[in-house]
């Protein structure tokens, strides 16, 4: 029974509809249909009018008192007829072509085929092999040079020029020092200050022998310096001894002069003063008798 029912269904619905493959044209309804807003943006047009039935109840309070003038104008749809598209109306009269501007064409009338100049056909210069003849060329002709053919000298000419440049000696002017120019004039304080600020003279050739590194490593220069210092000290010592001898001689001469001045004073002393040592002598002679 089940199989028979399936066979009947298969025969009745053998060809399935192809609604998914193509869209059938919808029949035009004669009922009035609400047109969409002119701006094609929902919520921006026809807000000044009373809200329709389709609008939600919240749209009644769409515009608030706290909104600025710009926001109120935007919520009401902006300026009137700002986003509306008007279809072009019917033309009155035949269409007229645009007039061509003066800067676009060279002549008021287009030139005919006879008036047109035939363009001169010329082959590029790099495709023509023709030797240059200066007699035939005009005075304004300038020979073209490639980017690498500026130097047209041979190797021998270039080497000769390099040797000549090496042989040439540059003569510098003589250096005149400021001190030599001012030798005859008296030196002032200002001149001395300027001379102090002047640059040092150029170093001349060294007269001394070059340094010997073996002698430098073995402290030979140190020994020479010590010997030189010792010789200088030996030269200074005799001068100091002579100075000490001269001071001693001056002191001896002063002492002798003081003794000479004291001797005449002793000669002028009275006779009583001369006998005093004799009076004092007897007690000295009596001392040994008492001791006996």
Curated annotation (Swiss-Prot):
Compositionally biased region (Polar residues): 176-189, 208-217, 240-250, 260-270
Keywords: Phosphoprotein
Positions where Phosphoserine occurs in the chain: 50
ATP-binding keyword on record: no
Record's compositionally biased regions (Basic and acidic residues): 221-239
Species per Swiss-Prot/TrEMBL record: Rattus norvegicus (Rat)
Disulfide bonds: none
Modifications after synthesis and translation: Phosphorylated upon DNA damage.
Region (Disordered): 29-50, 166-292
Name listed for the protein in its UniProt record: Uncharacterized protein C7orf57 homolog
Keyword Phosphoprotein: yes
Xref: Pfam families: DUF5524
InterPro entries reported for this sequence: DUF5524
């Amino acid at each position: 029974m089940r199989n028979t029912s399936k066979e009947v269904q298969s025969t009745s619905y053998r060809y399935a509809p192809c609604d998914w493959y193509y869209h059938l044209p919808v029949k035009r309804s004669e009922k009035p249909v609400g047109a969409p807003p002119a701006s094609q943006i929902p919520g921006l047009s026809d807000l000044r009018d009373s809200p329709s039935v389709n609008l939600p109840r919240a749209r009644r309070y769409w515009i608030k008192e706290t909104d600025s003038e710009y926001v109120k104008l935007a919520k009401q749809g902006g300026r009137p007829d700002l986003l509306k598209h008007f279809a072009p109306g019917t033309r009155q009269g035949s269409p007229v072509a645009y007039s061509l501007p003066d800067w676009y064409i060279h002549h008021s009338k287009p030139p005919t085929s006879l008036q047109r100049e035939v363009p001169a056909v010329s082959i590029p210069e790099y495709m023509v092999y023709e030797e240059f003849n200066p007699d035939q060329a005009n005075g304004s002709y300038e020979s073209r040079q490639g980017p690498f053919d500026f130097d047209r000298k041979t190797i021998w000419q270039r080497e000769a020029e390099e040797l000549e440049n090496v042989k040439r000696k540059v003569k510098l002017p003589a250096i005149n020092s400021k001190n030599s120019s001012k030798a005859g004039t008296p030196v002032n304080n200002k001149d001395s200050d300027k001379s102090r600020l002047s640059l040092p003279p150029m170093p001349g050739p060294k007269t001394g022998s070059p340094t010997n590194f073996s002698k430098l490593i073995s402290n030979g220069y140190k020994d020479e310096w010590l010997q030189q210092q010792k010789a200088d000290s030996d030269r200074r010592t005799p001068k100091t001894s002579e100075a000490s001898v001269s001071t001693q001689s001056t002191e001896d001469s002063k002492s002798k002069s003081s003794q000479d001045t004291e001797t005449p004073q002793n000669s002028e002393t009275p006779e009583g003063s001369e006998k005093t040592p004799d009076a004092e002598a007897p007690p000295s002679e009596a001392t040994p008798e008492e001791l006996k």
